[in-house]
Amino acid sequence: KSLVNIWIPDGLKDVPADRLSPRIRLRDSLDEVLACGYDKALVDVAVESKVFGIGVESYTVGSNEFYQNYAATRGICCLLDNGHYHPTETVSDKIPALLAFYDRLALHVTRGVRWDSDHVVLFEDELCEIAKEIVRNDAIDKVRIGLDYFDASINRLSAWITGQRALQKALLFALIQPNEALRSLQERGEFSELMVRMEEARTLPLGALWREYLRREGVTEDYFAEVRAYEAKILSERNECLTAK
């Protein structure tokens, strides 16, 4: 099943005089797009919000509230990009909030540095929390995960593999958490022990499990020699062709 995601960067650089009319136009335009018809058994449609962007610092038409209400009333998906919110907000907290009302969600997993910079995804705390919320809420089949990052200053193949593996590690780490035991402690109000057990879980043997996963998949943990070889043979030839032109 494919996912068609709609993100529209309409907005204004400075304070608007009318915040409603552009949103009415966007609502009606999206209705016209969806009215063209599509096979819902084969396609999921999602809408993606953003808090602000370059050139639209003061007002974004497709805000979080707009798209959550639009998706809920049209029976489509919300797509959450963890670089599209205020730095004090976390997508890991938004996932269970939306799962209380939506039967499916979509994600753009990225790594923002101070803003929506789309740095290469790394195995960091928020990525682990996103994975935990998906796993502990039995939402693996409900959440469509896409990666959203780029960095032209580094080898693109290495960036691709690093980000993919970071997400896989986070999901594996979430799968080995004692989720039921932790949930039980919370429900019983045993918050001191809950804190202790969650802290202990940070040192679960992810490394050994990750290496075993790679072994079963027939790939190695250290892939960088292959990246170097690809860089020397394929990318260098491509660069020579571009230079010649």
Residue ranges and their predicted role:
Residues 1-3, 21, 35, 41-43, ...:
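Alpha/beta catalytic barrel-like cores
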Residues 73-77, 99-105:
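Glycine-enriched alpha-helix->loop->beta-strand junction motifs that scaffold or abut catalytic
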Residues 84:
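Short, glycine/acidic-enriched loop or turn micro-motifs at the edges of active sites
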Residues 1-77, 180-181:
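Active-site acidic/histidine proton-transfer and metal-coordination neighborhood
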Residues 95-96:
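Glycine-rich, phosphate-binding/catalytic loops in enzymes
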Residues 91-92:
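Acidic catalytic motifs of isoprenoid enzymes
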